[in-house]
Amino acid sequence: MSAVPLTRMLPLRFLTHLLLLSFIPLYFCMEFSEDARNIEKIRRGNQWAIGHFMGKKSLQDTYNPSEQDMDSEDFRPRIIEMIRGTFRQEPIRALSPRKQDEIQWMLKKIMDDYIKTTQK
């Protein structure tokens, strides 16, 4: 009975694995390179929001209020200016320490409730 020693089988096994594993990445590289050639044939449709042209078309169609809108209750110029002033001043105004504590307490309560519901 002739048995092949283990020391002689290990190099052959290593060589076999090396050859097999070297072809697997080659197969995937070839598969992806073939798909890249077919991308040119895909119809892409309207590409107005691509790259540096992004948003150009949508800015041309902005809303212009009509006279009827300006006369309505919602579009009075004074109300619009008050709203703009509020938005400009809001980030500048600092919160009082009491208000900060209230907000922190609410956020803590929300987070606690969230953690309790996710653990169930």
Curated annotation (Swiss-Prot):
Domain of life: Eukaryota
Segment forming the signal sequence: 1-29
Alphabetical keyword list: Amidation, Cleavage on pair of basic residues, Secreted, Signal
Cellular component GO terms, alphabetical: extracellular region
InterPro entries: Bombesin
Propeptide feature ranges: 30-44, 58-120
Keyword Signal: yes
UniProt tissue specificity: Brain, intestine, and ovaries and early embryos (stages 2 and 10).
PROSITE patterns noted in UniProt: BOMBESIN
An individual GO BP term: neuropeptide signaling pathway
Residues found modified as Methionine amide: M54
Location in the cell: Secreted
UniProt function note: Stimulates smooth muscle contraction.
Family in the record: Belongs to the bombesin/neuromedin-B/ranatensin family.
Name of this chain's protein: Neuromedin-B
Originating species: Xenopus laevis (African clawed frog)
